[in-house]
Amino acid sequence: MTDTEMLRPILRGAWGRDTCDPHDLPDWTPENPARGQCGVTALIVQELLGGDLVLGEVLVGGGRVGYHYWNRLPGGRDIDFTADQFRPDEVVTGGTIQAVPVGGPRRCREQWELLRGRVLTALDDQERSRSVADGETPNRAR
């Protein structure tokens, strides 16, 4: 079972310049690893936890400068793993439900595949570690 608090550090550790949306690369830094990660992250969270993709607009001084994705979980709670990427002058508004692209995104596909692979590997490693801690022997026939 994957929960949001377990997922948060895994996502944060998996983000990198190579998983950033190309539009946001000029603003991405290791000090702000969430920058440009919203779309690919929201798709992976939706795959793991279900619910809806939500899309809002990013405004600066009242003018749109971009878009932002986050998740609405099956119980109706919104969760945004990349909300801390924004500067004080950037405001996210709106929020409309978006269709989940079948087979993954067309845009930022390489970034999504890379991030998805890192996250799934980390979750698998965590599950294996938990099994060993619980006394199970990994990869052995019983």
Task: Kindly label every feature range from the protein language model.
Residues 1-142:
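A structural boundary/capping signal
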